[in-house]
Amino acid sequence: SLFGYGAFSNEAVINSSKALYYFALGLPAFALIKIFSSFFFANHDTKTPFYISLFSVALNILISLYYFRYIGFIIIPIATTISSWFNSIVLFIYLINRSLFRFNNTFTSKFLKIIFASISMGLFFKFLTSFFENQLAYYYEYKILFLFLCVILCVVFYFLISILIKAFNSKDLKLKY
């Protein structure tokens, strides 16, 4: 582990790792909620996302309270992820039903290519961490260096794959002020 060295017990490191894993599964939902809510706000509708969020928070609390005695602390990040995905899906359904949002062919094509590039990068990262497993496990002094190297290589890999499959072009990368 990267952060265990005496600051946390082995059990605390494992538990933190599990919690981060389940919170990470909710990251796309958190981003989608922000995006989808903006469509409502742009149409002067702040109530719909608010009520959906209230229901999602209630769902989060109910799941957490009910399952905590059976599963323990890990239900909190799981419930947060479940309720966030629920929130984003309900917002999306409302947007579609109100004709406020529609996928076009360009978006769908690029989205699928970006998903492919992301999955490929994840697999490449898994390969790199397996390749550097001994260095990551035994050489504390170099652990940050190996991790930094893995991240840099993955970013380069992601951009190369993305350009190769035409997930985006150079015009998409330019910042517009």
Provide a role label for each language-model segment.
Residues S1-Y177:
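Membrane-embedded alpha-helical bundles of multi-pass transporters/translocases
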